[in-house]
Amino acid sequence: MAMSLRVVVPPHPLIGHWLTMLRHRETPPALYATALQELGRWLTYEALRDWLPHRREPIPTANGDTEGLVVESRAPLLAMPVMPGGLELWQGGRQVLPEASLCLNGVPDSIETNAGLVIFIDQITDGHAV
C-alpha cells in the first residue's frame, strides 16, 4: 500500500444529506451527533472503495464454485481521530473498520510499511495543516 494523501469528495446523496444536517443552524444536538457518525460511516466506506487491499478467491456455493473478493486482513489499518469531532466521525467509521487500531495520541512512532492510516477530522483544511 503506497503512502499518499488522498482527498475524496464522493457525490453520494446520503453524504450530501448528512453534511446538510451538520451545516443547518437549527439542527438539534442529538441529530448533529448522529449526522457526524453517519457522515463518518459513509465517508469511510467511500474512501476505502479503491484503497482497501483485497484478493480474489475461489469459493464453493450451493450452485457450484465461483470467485469472490476477500479483504486482506494482513495489512494493518490505523484510525486516528483528531479531537473533538473526529472521535464522533470515528464512531461511524468503526462500523466499516471494526478491526482498525485506534490511535488517540497521534501516529505511533513505528508502523508497518504496509499499514493504512485513516484520519478522522471534522475540519476542512488546505492540505498543509494535517
Q: Which residues make up each language-model segment?
A:
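PRPP-associated nucleotide enzymes
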Residues: M1-V130
